[in-house]
């Protein structure tokens, strides 16, 4: 008989559910990015929509997702189950895809985007909570990293698939959108057969995520973060405008998804070093560098001529995303009292979600009225104001 008394402890492995959730995220991202990589040009070229309408559609869609996130985690805790909301969220995402292929007007595209983003907002919080539910605390970092890595694979694969499908289907964007149904339904089937419908009881009774009475307990430092987040969001309008700019500078329709490929490649390569920079020197440095990168990106996109300048600007846009994504959420967590953290995130997501709508609408109107340079000049101006506020206020530890 073997003596195992002194054997080293067995290292915990990432649960099967986390792998399934990662694959679900990957397939849905492939489905969504196939559509998103071409949608701005489908609206303007095929449907003859104004750029202002593109901004309105994207702004409403993204703000809807942000606002839905405020309440989805609470509902998940309230009903005591994660799977129903996860399934509903991914189901709405998959069901929206046929509407893009059938759309004969901007109104139907608007409805499809609204349904798709409601689904994204509903599934995000319960999905992340389920990862925590099934994973031992000592490997949760690895578990979240795995899910995010598979999600990133989808963000690359979707635009690349769109390029291949455009060549195969002779630039028929409706046919490409129809193909996006396949990975979307694959994601839904994986949720149905691969995720257990286990109950999840929080340690304390779930609280409404946004309570007016809690706002009095949030101090000036927190509201400064909200103000900076709002100003930063005004500078961060939809990536649809990057696709439109590249097309205006001569990028062929079939290669339009290359914009998101380049942006996501730079973003993914820079995210880990940016995290190391934040760990080593605090959150302020990467935020300032990210804002400087965004200003430089806007300068290239607003004043540069030709595709080389445009793609350099797109790469800088990816740099700013790598440096800034997650930093503001970190600041919200730091500046809000622990007992009010849920309400603090609710306020922040609500404020930035509504601001995203205003930012994208303004960007679209400026594009139609004064041309692409005005859109990117305005974005650069908001980024410069945000950089000034960060550099001169004691909001973020240096």
Language model regions located:
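Transmembrane alpha-helix termini and helix-breaking/packing motifs in multi-pass membrane transporters
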Residues: 41-46, 157-177, 358-374
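Juxtamembrane intracellular "pre-TM" segments in multi-pass secondary transporters
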Residues: 2-16, 197-228
């Amino acid at each position: 008989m073997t003596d195992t008394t002194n054997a080293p402890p067995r290292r915990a492995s990432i649960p099967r559910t986390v792998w399934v959730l990662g694959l679900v995220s990957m397939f849905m991202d492939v489905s969504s990015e196939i559509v998103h990589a071409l949608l701005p040009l489908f609206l303007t070229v095929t449907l003859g929509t104004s750029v202002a309408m593109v901004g309105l559609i994207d702004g409403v869609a993204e703000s809807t997702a942000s606002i839905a996130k405020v309440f989805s985690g609470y509902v998940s805790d309230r009903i005591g189950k994660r799977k129903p909301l996860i399934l509903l969220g991914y189901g709405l995402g998959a069901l929206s895809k046929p509407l893009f292929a059938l759309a004969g007007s901007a109104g139907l595209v608007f409805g499809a985007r609204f349904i798709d983003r409601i689904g994204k907002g509903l599934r995000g919080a319960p999905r992340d909570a389920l990862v925590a539910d099934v994973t031992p605390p000592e490997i949760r970092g690895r578990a979240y990293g795995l899910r995010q890595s598979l999600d990133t694979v989808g963000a690359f694969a979707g635009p690349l698939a769109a390029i291949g499908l455009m060549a195969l289907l002779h630039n028929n964007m409706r046919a490409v959108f129809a193909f996006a149904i396949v990975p979307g339904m694959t994601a839904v089937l994986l949720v149905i057969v691969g995720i257990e419908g286990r109950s999840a009881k929080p340690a304390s009774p779930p609280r409404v995520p946004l309570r007016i009475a809690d706002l009095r307990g949030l101090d000036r430092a927190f509201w400064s973060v909200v103000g900076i987040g709002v100003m930063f969001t005004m500078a961060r309008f939809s990536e649809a405008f990057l696709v439109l700019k590249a097309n205006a500078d001569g990028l062929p329709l079939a290669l339009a998804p290359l914009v998101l490929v380049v942006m996501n490649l730079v973003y993914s390569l820079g995210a880990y070093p940016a995290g190391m920079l934040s760990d080593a020197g605090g959150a302020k440095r990467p935020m300032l560098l990210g804002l400087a990168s965004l200003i430089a990106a806007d300068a290239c996109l607003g004043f540069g001529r030709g595709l080389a300048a445009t793609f350099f600007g797109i790469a800088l846009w990816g740099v700013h995303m790598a440096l800034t994504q997650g930093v503001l959420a970190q600041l919200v967590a730091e500046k809000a009292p622990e007992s009010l953290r849920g309400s603090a995130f609710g306020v922040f997501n609500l404020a930035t979600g509504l601001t995203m709508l205003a930012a994208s609408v303004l960007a679209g109107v400026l594009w139609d009225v004064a041309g692409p340079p005005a859109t990117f000049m305005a974005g650069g101006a908001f980024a410069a104001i945000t950089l000034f506020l960060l550099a001169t206020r004691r909001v973020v530890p240096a």
